[in-house]
């Protein structure tokens, strides 16, 4: 069972949460959000823990992260998650700067972790 941390409990985090509930191979185990009530609501729906983004990324009980946070946070989260060895699914856009996107891709390649960008 792939253990997923959902970063961002807004609309898109809720969409990904509903998708995870339909899978037999993955489950949400942790949720973070800037708004505590949003994180708690989504976590409660999944029997998951509310944690900070840094705690989720550092947790040995989390295999992968779904990044559904504002675009300006993606760069730092991707860098940190890759260095921590987490598989990463990131909402688009990865960043608004092509240089920063390249840096993210370099870090992901160096860490040899799975990385996927969402596109509807």
Regions found by a protein language model. Name each.
Residues 102-120:
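Rossmann-fold dehydrogenase core element
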Residues 1-46:
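N-terminal Rossmann-like dinucleotide-binding module
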Residues 48-107:
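Beta-loop-alpha module in the N-terminal Rossmann-like domain of NAD(P)-dependent dehydrogenases
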Residues 30, 63-64, 114:
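Short, Asp-centered acidic motifs that coordinate Mg2+ and/or phosphate
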Residues 23-25, 84, 109-113:
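Short helix-capping segments at alpha-helix termini
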Residues 9, 67, 93, 118-119:
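Glycine- and other small-residue-rich loops at beta-strand/loop junctions that grip anionic moieties
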